[in-house]
Amino acid sequence: MDRQTSPRDLPRAQFLAERALTTLERFLHVEAVSGIVLLVAAAVALIWANSPFAQSYHDLWHLPLSIGLGTFVYAQSLHFWVNDALMTVFFLVVGMEIRREIHEGALSKLDQAILPVAAAAGGVIVPALIYLVLNTDMVRAHGWAVPTATDIAFAVGVLALLGRSIPGNLRVFLLALAIIDDVVAVLIIAFFYSGGLDPSGFAIAALGVVMVVGLQRIGVGSAYAYVLPGAVIWVGLLVTGAHPTLAGVVLGLMTPVMSIPMREQPIDVLSRISEELRSHDAVSTKDARRLAHPRRQLRLANREMLPPVVRVQTALHPWVAYGVMPLFALANAGVSVGGVNLFAGEAHLAMLGVGLALVVGKPLGVVGATWFMVRMGWCRLPPGVSWGGILLIGLLAGIGFTMSIFIAILAFADENLLAAAKLGVLLGSSVAALLGLGWGALYVRRLRARTGAHD
């Protein structure tokens, strides 16, 4: 009987490469790491924009980049391609997260969804009101939505830093709240920051949607086949005047949550073909052609083991967390502090409004709405979640960062107001993260003390 090949029997270089790859994959899926990478990218942008090399920072993002086909050439700055094209992939992942939660997650049942929905609503309304109280001028008031967003990567990353003592239901509550926040942010962008819409673009976007539906109806499961329809939707939304990144949300919400039906279950196909291949002592060059069909079946079965929404989201997660979002932070967090005139057009009120709304408004809205729903008897706190945990969620929800900066870019045409709003986002998100870490450490200590007392 042949001895099973162990990893140690592999050539040393291959063994080391496989171990390194496995370690890297585990490292990249640690939630706290993506938040740290994002923070480093933002810090680099800030330092660069306030260094003697600040001009090179601005020159880089205004570098023209064009795509062309024949006589057609479309040229835009590198900043545009990051904010309007690459961020579509981020919104694609957001759309798929929403799709999954509606199908089988926290948003799949009304009784489970109502409390995080109420908390998210409070976390949108109260910060917006605080901002508007300080910014009554029409130009500055246009930024009311900037502090309403939550950066899910940062918030979950900070929660992960607090360790395994955090109750699982608390993490689920934060994820549900952040995803609902994403839904609200997408709706806000679509309805309030899309400007005058050109109807001609809707026909192009509709063509892309029809292409997606058509591919799904004929059973095309390869994600690559949907790149072209996605690009058509993106172009259509760009022509309409809506923000083209919404194409990612549309495509994400259309991603199937069930695998393509097969005559055999994928696991049965894998078992059958594996047995067939084992039955051959060796595969000669002449037999290679006969293996083409089994190999195709193996690839299809392996692909359909997971639903498309899970498969694509899992594949894109590292690229978004360690590529798209840090690049967005690098391109947009570089605010020249010395170049901001906080008293021109009362820009300091925009900065103060955003900062206070994130640090004070978010926890006040989240905790207040949750308390109201529980007090009225319409909801109960999830098992294992205390009011201290809800306060922690409220503080972490104040980390607006990526989405808040994104909305600020859409809200303010004035460069000085935009810079002031970005400063408010950076300062407010940093304070919210520090308060969340501080309160979270105290909360975890109390949980451990309580657990120890019961043992």
UniProtKB/Swiss-Prot annotation:
Coiled coil: none annotated. It comes from the Bacteria. The chain crosses the membrane at residues 27-47, 53-73, 114-134, 143-163, 172-192, 195-215, 242-262, 320-340, 349-369, 390-410, 424-444. It is a multi-pass membrane protein. It is found in: Cell inner membrane. Gene3D superfamilies: Na+/H+ antiporter like domain. Keywords: Antiport, Cell inner membrane, Cell membrane, Ion transport, Membrane, Sodium, Sodium transport, Transmembrane, Transmembrane helix, Transport. It catalyses: Na(+)(in) + 2 H(+)(out) = Na(+)(out) + 2 H(+)(in). InterPro entries: Na/H_antiporter_dom_sf, NhaA. GO terms for cellular component: plasma membrane. Its main location: membrane. One of its GO terms (molecular function) is sodium:proton antiporter activity. GO terms for biological process: regulation of pH. Na(+)/H(+) antiporter that extrudes sodium in exchange for external protons. Belongs to the NhaA Na(+)/H(+) (TC 2.A.33) antiporter family. This is Na(+)/H(+) antiporter NhaA.
